């Protein structure tokens, strides 16, 4: 399991936070960590450029490309990664030891497992624990509950063809990636402990993603491999509307047994309070 993990960090103008991210990696470094790859996605901020130069001098692999978006930046880093397992980390977050200490063991133990993910701790403009549910495809089809910071086999990335670099809007790459991995039969395993720290800050895409729901739903679920999931999602939403209408007409108490049955069958719907966005990126929209 030594030298099995490649950490890939897309970076755009967040040099101050990037130092903190790197420090968190060094603080939990284990023999499983093979390399740290930083992909500069066309940064223009002088501080960030200076930080990147310093990291390069410290023997980190720094790749540079014109601003093409977070999906392209991740793909560029993963493409050259030598590790069997990939851990994408946003350049304003911090990781904990669990991913490097326990993740590779789980993946080595069971070849059918493609993705290992865990809970997160919010910091910055929000605090508290983000408790991620056990994996359930119906729940994932309804709404994303997995951040990009999850350990997965490089073979998963190869199998799905990488992150979509042509999203009409940024911030949805993770959900699309996880769905395409799931429909190909890869198993997801949940570590029930905090595996990384998730920064909530002004100016991130945390509050922007949901504005593009309709456009992105149409784009993602028109993909050939996701059409069936799109039909499932539409039916789930239709049933939800029926449930809400019946609750209005009959009262919530009468429908408690029905809601309990739906929860048992589908794993329950993802609530906004669990995690308010589908995913988020620290890379700006690319100007075409």
Locate the predicted segments by residue.
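Short, acidic, metal-binding catalytic loop of nucleotide-sugar glycosyltransferases
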Residues: 23-33
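Short beta-strand/loop segment that forms part of the nucleotide-sugar
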Residues: 33-42, 63-66
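A conserved acidic beta->alpha catalytic loop
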Residues: 40-49, 90
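Glycine-rich, basic loop-to-helix element that forms the pyrophosphate-binding segment
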Residues: 65-81
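Short aromatic/hydrophobic "clamp" motif used to bind/position activated sugar donors
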Residues: 86
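Conserved donor NDP-sugar-binding/catalytic core segment of glycosyltransferases
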Residues: 98-130
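Acidic donor-binding loop at a coil-to-helix junction in glycosyltransferase catalytic cores
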Residues: 169-177
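Boundary detector for helix-to-coil junctions that initiate low-complexity/charged tails
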Residues: 211-288
């Amino acid at each position: 399991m030594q030298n099995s993990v490649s950490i890939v960090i897309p970076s755009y103008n967040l040099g101050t936070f990037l130092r903190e991210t790197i420090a968190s990696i060094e603080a939990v470094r284990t023999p499983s960590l093979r390399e740290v790859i930083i992909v500069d996605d066309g940064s223009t901020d002088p501080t960030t450029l200076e930080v990147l130069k310093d990291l390069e001098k410290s023997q980190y692999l720094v790749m540079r490309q014109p601003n093409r978006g977070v999906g392209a930046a991740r793909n560029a880093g993963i493409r050259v990664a030598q590790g069997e397992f990939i851990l994408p980390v946003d350049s304003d977050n911090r990781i904990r030891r669990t991913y490097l200490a326990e993740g590779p063991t789980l993946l080595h133990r069971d070849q059918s497992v493609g993705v290992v993910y865990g809970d997160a701790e919010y910091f910055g403009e929000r605090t508290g624990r983000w408790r991620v549910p056990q994996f359930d495809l119906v729940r994932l089809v309804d709404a994303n509950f997995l951040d990009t910071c999850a350990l997965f086999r490089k073979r998963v990335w190869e199998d799905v063809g990488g992150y979509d670099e042509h999203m009409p809007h940024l911030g949805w790459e993770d959900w699309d990636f996880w769905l395409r991995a799931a429909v190909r039969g890869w198993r997801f395993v949940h570590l029930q402990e905090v595996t990384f720290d998730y920064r909530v800050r002004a100016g991130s895409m945390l509050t922007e993603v949901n504005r593009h729901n309709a456009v992105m739903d149409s784009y993602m679920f028109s993909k050939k491999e996701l059409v069936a999931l799109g039909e499932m999602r539409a039916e789930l939403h239709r049933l939800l509307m029926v449930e809400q209408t019946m609750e209005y007409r009959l009262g919530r108490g009468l429908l408690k047994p029905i809601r309990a049955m739906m929860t048992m069958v589908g794993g329950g719907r993802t609530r906004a309070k669990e995690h308010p966005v589908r995913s988020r990126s620290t890379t700006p929209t690319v100007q075409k």
